[in-house]
């Protein structure tokens, strides 16, 4: 389908973008356009003004800052996947990014756009939650920081206010103790289930476990029932199995033409088990 007629704005600063966004509640930000343009073409969204961030300086940064990697919201998926800094400090992010669609999409789509879209099958929301990252947002009312645990509130829903723009994404360095798994019918398809795990070990005991699940559930979410089975225990195949069973049982699954809730339950349980084992092997 063709796009409808639209009004287009290309601000030269983040402040100008915030001003434009605040003056019209039906306006929308466009970054890479890989989420917004398809829904506009299907007439599922009809913004009064499309505000393009492409000419705002400083939004494509990717840099190491202390124990964090800092990303601008306009950094593309391809840039992240191919970044030496990401490969060194956030290898799980590089691994997850290779599952995103196809090269053409990865060359255009952006980190900030994916996080703001809040798709439960999206790789970046899952990674941000598992790695305990955070986003900085700005509006005409000022700036604030949103922790990953507070960002995703429902299907395609985030805690961003309608007039807020993501300006920075901060993710703590995590070179080890991680696992990522995703199942899709074909390479480049949306994942029917994806799981990310990070954990630490000290004196043979597991700690600081974060397990995030997407794709099979209505929103990106952590799995505290699985985390509780692991924290304070010794990692073993039996413990990984017990955690995966407890975690998978605690979730509510979507059911559609691509897979039943029962099918997705099985996928999630196996992916949790595998990613726990992978994370343990990388500690």
From Swiss-Prot:
The keyword Flavoprotein is assigned to this record: yes
Sequence ranges assigned to domain FAD-binding PCMH-type in this UniProt record: 1-176
Binding of FAD, residues: 31-35, 110-114
Keywords, in A-Z order: Alkaloid metabolism, Cytoplasm, FAD, Flavoprotein, Oxidoreductase, Plasmid
GO MF terms, alphabetically ordered: FAD binding; nicotine dehydrogenase activity
EC annotation from Swiss-Prot or TrEMBL: 1.5.99.4
Pfam families: CO_deh_flav_C, FAD_binding_5
Disulfide bonds: none
Single Gene Ontology BP annotation: nicotine catabolic process
Subcellular location: Cytoplasm
Industrial or biotech use: Due to the increased usage of tobacco products, the industry generates solid and liquid tobacco wastes containing high concentrations of nicotine, which dissolves easily in water leading to the contamination of the ground water. Nicotine-degrading microbes can be used for bioremediation of these nicotine-polluted environments.
Pathways involved: Alkaloid degradation; nicotine degradation; 6-hydroxypseudooxynicotine from nicotine (R-isomer route): step 1/2; Alkaloid degradation; nicotine degradation; 6-hydroxypseudooxynicotine from nicotine (S-isomer route): step 1/2
InterPro entries reported in the protein's UniProt record: CO_DH_flav_C, CO_DH_flav_C_dom_sf, Diverse_Substr_Oxidored, FAD-bd_PCMH, FAD-bd_PCMH-like_sf, FAD-bd_PCMH_sub1, FAD-bd_PCMH_sub2, Mopterin_DH_FAD-bd
Stimuli inducing this protein: Expression requires the presence of nicotine and molybdenum.
UniProt cofactor(s): FAD
Cofactor: binding comment: Binds 1 FAD per subunit.
Description of how activity is regulated: Nicotine dehydrogenase activity is inhibited by tungsten.
Reaction(s) catalysed (UniProt annotation): (R)-nicotine + A + H2O = (R)-6-hydroxynicotine + AH2; (S)-nicotine + A + H2O = (S)-6-hydroxynicotine + AH2
Any GO CC annotation of this UniProt entry: cytoplasm
Job description of the protein: Component of the nicotine 6-hydroxylase, which is involved in the degradation of nicotine. Catalyzes the hydroxylation of the pyridine ring at C6 to form 6-hydroxynicotine. Can use both L-nicotine and D-nicotine.
Subunit relationships: Heterotrimer composed of a large subunit (NdhL), a medium subunit (NdhM) and a small subunit (NdhS).
Name this polypeptide is given: Nicotine 6-hydroxylase medium subunit
């Amino acid at each position: 389908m063709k796009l409808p007629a639209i009004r287009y704005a290309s601000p030269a600063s983040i402040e100008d973008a915030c001003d434009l966004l605040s003056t019209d509640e039906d306006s929308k930000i466009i970054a890479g356009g890989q989420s917004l343009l398809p829904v506009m073409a299907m007439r599922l969204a009809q913004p009064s003004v499309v505000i393009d961030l492409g000419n705002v300086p400083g939004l494509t940064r990717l840099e190491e800052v202390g124990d964090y990697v800092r990303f601008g919201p306009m950094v593309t998926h391809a840039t992240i996947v191919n970044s030496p800094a990401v490969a060194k400090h956030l290898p799980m992010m590089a691994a997850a990014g290779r599952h995103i669609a196809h090269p053409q999409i990865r060359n255009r789509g952006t980190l900030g756009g994916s996080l703001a879209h809040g798709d439960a099958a999206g790789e970046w929301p899952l990674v941000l939650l598992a790695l305990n990252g955070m986003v900085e947002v700005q509006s005409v009312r000022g700036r604030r920081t949103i922790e990953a645990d507070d960002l995703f509130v429902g299907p395609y829903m985030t805690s961003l206010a309608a007039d807020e723009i993501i300006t920075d994404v901060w993710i703590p360095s995590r070179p080890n103790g991680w696992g990522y798994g995703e199942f899709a019918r074909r390479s480049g398809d949306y994942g029917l289930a994806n799981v990310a795990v990070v954990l630490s070990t000290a004196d043979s005991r597991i700690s600081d476990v974060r397990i995030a699940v997407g794709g099979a559930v209505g929103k990106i979410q952590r799995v505290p029932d699985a985390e509780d089975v692991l924290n304070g225990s010794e990692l073993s195949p039996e413990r990984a199995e017990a955690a995966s069973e407890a975690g998978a049982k605690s979730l509510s699954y979507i059911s559609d033409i691509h897979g039943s809730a029962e099918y997705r339950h099985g996928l999630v349980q196996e992916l949790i088990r595998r990613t726990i084992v992978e994370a343990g092997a990388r500690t």
